[in-house]
Amino acid sequence: MGLELVTSGKNLPEEINVVIEIPKDSEPVKYEVDKASGAIFVDRILSTPMRYPCNYGYVPNTLCGDGDPADVLVVLPLPLVPGSVVRCRPVGVLRMSDEAGSDEKILAVPIEKIFSGYAHIEDINQVSSHWMERIGHFFEHYKDLEKGKWVKLDGWGGAAEAKRILTESVERYNSDAP
């Protein structure tokens, strides 16, 4: 099945579908899903011996300023299988840039039906500071040993900013679609 058949979400931007590419706490391998075929490719092996602190994926049928779909960090105590789709609520955004330009990461929690443990989280200020520190540390350092690559963190934004980014990314995707 081509992943283009998976929608961005039923009630965007309040609820989004996230295709998982990298499970939480997995080996330091950067996977990327080929959007047309659905195949999971190894993009690269991270040079730093670090594990992703949360499940990492993207929202289908979105297009951000960097030319890629919207990246999403799914806060959940368990790893999810690559290629799985999880319905989430955006609660914040990690503002960052790298050698290729702006590269925001939407922070999301699963909807209550999937995991009720985070049903109370509506905005970034309700996310554990421990989670936020782990995520920030990972993204600030995961490219440290890769030549010509760098990352700069520009702080956190709330749910309203995350939802604005998602809305704009869907509009950009729709305006660029053939």
Swiss-Prot record:
- The record's principal subcellular location, in a coarse class, is cytoplasm
Intracellular or extracellular location(s) = Cytoplasm
Enzyme class at the top of the EC tree: hydrolase
Q: What EC number(s) does this enzyme carry?
A: 3.6.1.1
Q: Does the keyword Protein transport apply?
A: no
Q: Which CDD domains does this UniProt record tie to the protein?
A: pyrophosphatase
Residues annotated to bind Mg(2+) 1: D66, D71, D103
Cofactor list: Mg(2+)
Q: Name one GO biological process term.
A: phosphate-containing compound metabolic process
Give the SUPFAM superfamilies listed for this entry.
Inorganic pyrophosphatase
One GO CC annotation, please?
Answer: cytoplasm
As for what it does, the entry says: Catalyzes the hydrolysis of inorganic pyrophosphate (PPi) forming two phosphate ions.
| Quaternary context | Homohexamer.
Q: Which family does it belong to?
A: Belongs to the PPase family.
UniProt name for this protein: Inorganic pyrophosphatase
- Provide the organism lineage as a comma list: Bacteria, Pseudomonadati, Pseudomonadota, Gammaproteobacteria, Lysobacterales
